[in-house]
Amino acid sequence: LGVIGLELGQSLHRLGVDIVGIDMAESIGGISDPDVNKEAIQLIGKEFPLWLGTGAAISEGENGQLVVTAGDNSKSVDKVLVAIGRKPNLASLNLEAAGIELDDRGIPVYDRHTMQIGDSHIFIAGDVSGERPLLHEAGDEGRIAGHNAVSASITAFRRKTPLNITFSDPNVC
């Protein structure tokens, strides 16, 4: 259950909507510390069920309902909120024709301190980098990419410490 799924799920739950949080990962809210994750799961799990570590399937149920199944769990629901992030849409750019090396996700290989793609005159910023699709990160990347795109020489910047904040209750940082 990622950051957006957790934030929206908890908000909807507190507005009276029956919620189940499902994720293939064993963590919630982007938490990387195992002890913090365990505590967060216990706290959030008191509010609504968390089905973690398993994929989910959706099928048609009775009376227009949907049936969500994840592992041994199953629930009939009226609506499903899918918060799975987004994949950068680069395929139509045919970057390979420009000699741009792509990683195994189809994202250009770039220097995160200059935002320069390889040795090219192309710079990358924002969600398309596939690194941290967050507004404040995109702003930082855009500042670096823009500076280097118009400068006579490329400058490697020291990136800001990435913030990972989930606006849940309790807040998770």
PLM segments and residue spans:
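FAD-site-proximal beta/loop scaffold in flavoenzymes
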Residues: K75, K79-S153
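Residue-level detector of conserved, well-ordered beta-strand and adjacent loop positions
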Residues: T69, E96, F167
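Short coil/turn connectors at secondary-structure junctions
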Residues: L1, L15-D18, S76-V77, D119-S120
